[in-house]
């Protein structure tokens, strides 16, 4: 699965979240969240958890 950083940024903006806020809600450090966001490949579990934190469907944050 390929994560779309642009789509994640849009979802974060809708929720008025920073990377720090996202990391706290996800349960990881800010540095680890940056690694997740900047990597192209993401596991199904990780994508699902990220989508849940952002209150979006997982398909909304993946490349098509």
Where are these regions (language model features)?
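A short, Lys/Arg-rich alpha-helix, primarily the initiator
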Residues: 1-21, 25
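Short C-terminal boundary/hinge segments that cap the last helix of small helical domains
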Residues: 55-64
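Helix-turn-helix DNA-binding elements, focusing on the entry/boundary residues of the two helices
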Residues: 19, 30, 44-47
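Short, basic-rich loop-to-helix N-cap that marks the start of a DNA-contacting helix
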Residues: 39-52
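Recognition helix of helix-turn-helix/homeodomain-like DNA-binding domains
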Residues: 27-42
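Residue-level detection of the helix-turn-helix DNA-binding "recognition helix"
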Residues: 13, 38, 63
